[in-house]
Regions:
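A short glycine-rich, Lys/Arg-flanked "PGG" loop and its adjoining helix->strand segment in the class I
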Residues: 216-231
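Serine-dependent acyl-ester chemistry module
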Residues: 290-294
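Short catalytic micro-motifs in class I SAM-dependent methyltransferases
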Residues: 206-213, 235, 258
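Rossmann-like adenosine-cofactor binding region
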Residues: 189, 210, 219-223, 236-239
Length: 340
C-alpha cells in the first residue's frame, strides 16, 4: 500500500534534477572543502577496525577515497568506512570544520526554498499518508536532526499533531525555536525518556543514517525512547542503488568524512531486527539516479550505461528511473519500521 502513497508524490518529483537541489558550483565547493578537512581533522586520528555494521561479518576492502578506506560486506553488501576514525575526531570535525559550516550556512540557505518545494512538501505529504495508514491517533511527530525546521513547517501545514525537533546544533536549534517549535537541543543518544511525553510517537529522520558513527548504538537508543508500536520513518543511501553501483568510488555520494554507512534493502532489515524493530516497508523512491549518472558520465566505466546516456531521450530516461525506483534499485531508500 505504500506504493500508492509514492504515486501521490510522483508529480512533484518526476522532473526533479540534481542541479536544483545541489547546484554544481556550490556542491563542488563543499566537496573541495570536505577533502581538505579530511586531512586537517582525520590525518592523525586513531582508527578502529570494525565488522559489518549490519550483519557483523568481516568486510573486504574495496577502495580508498580521500584517505578513508571503505569495505564491502561479502554477505549483505553493506558498504562502510573501515577502519573508522574514533568518535572524538568526528565531533571535532562537525563542530569546527569549514566544510560543515559551509553546508549548514551557505549550501543549506542557498537551496532552502527549492528543497522546500521539491523535497519537503511532497515528503510531508508522504509521511502524513503513512501515519494515517498506521492509524496512529493523538500522536507526536519527532524530527531527529531537524536542521532549519523546514520539514516541520510543512508537516504543521497538513496535520494538527505536535511536531517536536531534536537538534543538537545550537544555532539551528535557535532557528527552530524562533519558528515556534519545541526543540530538544541534544544528540539523540543523549535524549532521555523524561524529555518526551507519553503520547504515541512517529520519529522521522532524513539523510542522517549514513552519517552515524555507530548506527546500532543510535537504533538501540532510539528504541529505548519508544513505546511498542511507535513508528520510525527514515531515509538514507543504498549501497546497491544504481548510481552508487555504477560510479562506486567515484560516486559523489561516497563522500568522506560525511557518509560512513551505505546499507541497502536487505541489510537495513538485518540491523533493524537485531535492535528491536519490525521492518514494515522498505522502498527506494529516489528520482535522481539517472541524472547523477548523466552529471558524472566521465567517471562511468560500464559500456552499457555510457551508450544509454549518450543515445536515450528524456522520456526514455524517465521510464528507466521509474523502473529503478519501483523495483528497489534506487540509491535513495526509505524505511518504515516500528518498535516490537
Amino acid at each position: 500500500f505504500f506504493f500508492i502513497l509514492l504515486l501521490i508524490t510522483q508529480d512533484f518529483l518526476n522532473n526533479l534534477k540534481e542541479s536544483e537541489i545541489r547546484p554544481k558550483n556550490i556542491f563542488d565547493e563543499f566537496l573541495r572543502l570536505a577533502k581538505l578537512d579530511t586531512e586537517t581533522y582525520f590525518a592523525n586520528s586513531n582508527r578502529e577496525k570494525i565488522m559489518c555494521p549490519a550483519c557483523g561479518a568481516v568486510g573486504k576492502h574495496s577502495f580508498q577515497k580521500d584517505n578513508f578506506d571503505y569495505s564491502e560486506c561479502p554477505k549483505c553488501r553493506t558498504l562502510y568506512v573501515n577502519p573508522r576514525p574514533i568518535m572524538d575526531s568526528f565531533t571535532n570535525y562537525y563542530t569546527n570544520s569549514p566544510s560543515s559550516k559551509f553546508w549548514a550556512t551557505t549550501f543549506y540557505l542557498e537551496t532552502a526554498e527549492v528543497r522546500r518545494k521539491k523535497i519537503w512538501q511532497p515528503k510531508a505529504q508522504l509521511i502524513n499518508g503513512i501515519i494515517d495508514m498506521q492509524v496512529i491517533e493523538n500522536f507526536q511527530i519527532i524530527d531527529i536532526g531537524g536542521g532549519y525546521g523546514i520539514f516541520a513547517e510543512e508537516m504543521q501545514k497538513i496535520t494538527d499533531q505536535d511536531v517536536i525537533i531534536i537538534e543538537p546544533a545550537p544555532h539551528l536549534a535557535e532557528v527552530c525555536r524562533n519558528k515556534g517549535f519545541k526543540v530538544i537541543e541534544k544528540f539523540l543518544e543523549n535524549v532521555s525518556i523524561i524529555d518526551l511525553s507519553k503520547k504515541p510517537k512517529c520519529f522521522v529522520s532524513f539523510e542522517l543514517f549514513e552519517h552515524l558513527h555507530s548506527p546500532e548504538y543510535f537504533l538501540v537508543n532510539l528504541n529505548s525512547l519508544m513505546q511498542p508500536n511507535d513508528i520510525f520513518i527514515f531515509t538514507t543511501l543504498s549501497s546497491t542503488g544504481l548510481d552508487i553501483q555504477v560510479l562506486w568510488e567515484n560516486s559523489p555520494s561516497v563522500s568522506p568524512p560525511h557518509h560512513l554507512n551505505f546499507f541497502n534493502p536487505v541489510s537495513i532489515k538485518i540491523i533493524l531486527e537485531k535492535t528491536g524493530f519490525e521492518c514494515v516497508e522498505v522502498t527506494t523512491p529516489g528520482k535522481l539516479d539517472i541524472d547523477i549518472l548523466e552529471n558524472n558520465k566521465n567517471d562511468i566505466k560500464d559500456q552499457f550505461w555510457k551508450i544509454f546516456l549518450e543515445t536515450s531521450n528524456e522520456k526514455c530516461k524517465q521510464k528507466w528511473q521509474s523502473m529503478i525506483s519501483d523495483t528497489g534499485w534506487s540509491s535513495h531508500i526509505m524505511i518504515v519500521c516500528k518498535k516490537v
